[in-house]
């Protein structure tokens, strides 16, 4: 009886991706192409890959392996734990840890051959004592040139460069800084930071220099130095404001339609009854909500961002653009599908939340945020599919 019962189900019900309430497709071929594009734009500089925050939410294992296979030999992560995970997928790469090192992490750093990026006097002192005891191991130095986040003060870095008393086991292989306004090419801050970093680069003669992340690469060769550090551009996001995005989309998020329902003119939709229907409508209830990173600020009405004049978000289903109706809830979002022909949509279809037809940065703008946050904020309920990159 059990065998007959199991045999009565169609084969596709065993395919987790095809039947998932939420799906995330990651195009590894597009990821590799985007890295090659950044490499070409970087000119003579080597091109690293930033894979922090689980490769911007898309999976450090698959993305890291793809980028390594594409040719990346320098990687940047945020934490020692991320670096340890990446090491298996990038066996001969240099892996820089942007948050540096804390006491107790020495073994992980040495065992996984990670390069801590030192950004404070405390980290410098601890690292010098560590290598004096354990022996030579490469490190990097982060110098603040105006961002006022992480980094050694400029004068301290210049003093360190000339400090003949520093131990021989102290072996910086890279000095880096980070631009505050690279996404706005006209900002005078870019040139000011460039001039400061040129002083740092000259002071640490013989040590590689790195200033540019994704947006900085687009500022041109003056900003490239020895190594560039693309991040968001690899994953298809916009790096520069107010210009066409040349990168290939990498991620596509989709939510399954649970139900399609009719609603009359004058009725309201979702919490707060703030979304008033001005005509008889058809509504599709999709299995995605703010628990999945589809933020409440993407709501069609009834929240402060909407009242400030931002347009609501939309999805695409079977080639048709459909706006969000009413407030996004924890697990569900309602889309107005009135203008989709009845024979072109049904329960079980998928609405593209962002992807090739709905740029992730456009969705982010509707939420009052940026593509970085949309990608890194994806929840745990997406069934993932990785499209393998061609050689």
Swiss-Prot record:
MF GO annotations: alanine racemase activity; pyridoxal phosphate binding
Active site: 52, 271
Catalytic activity: L-alanine = D-alanine
Entry keyword Isomerase: yes
InterPro entries on file: Ala_racemase (IPR000821), Ala_racemase/Decarboxylase_C (IPR009006), Ala_racemase_C (IPR011079), Ala_racemase_N (IPR001608), Ala_racemase_pyridoxalP-BS (IPR020622), PLP-binding_barrel (IPR029066)
Keywords: Cell shape, Cell wall biogenesis/degradation, Isomerase, Peptidoglycan synthesis, Pyridoxal phosphate
Annotated GO biological process: cell wall organization; D-alanine biosynthetic process; peptidoglycan biosynthetic process; regulation of cell shape
CDD domains recorded: PLPDE_III_AR (cd00430)
Matching SUPFAM superfamilies: Alanine racemase C-terminal domain-like, PLP-binding barrel
Positions bound to substrate: 149, 330
Ranges annotated as spanning the membrane: none
Name listed for the protein in its UniProt record: Alanine racemase, biosynthetic
Organism: Agrobacterium fabrum (strain C58 / ATCC 33970)
Phylogenetic classification of the source organism: Bacteria, Pseudomonadati, Pseudomonadota, Alphaproteobacteria, Hyphomicrobiales
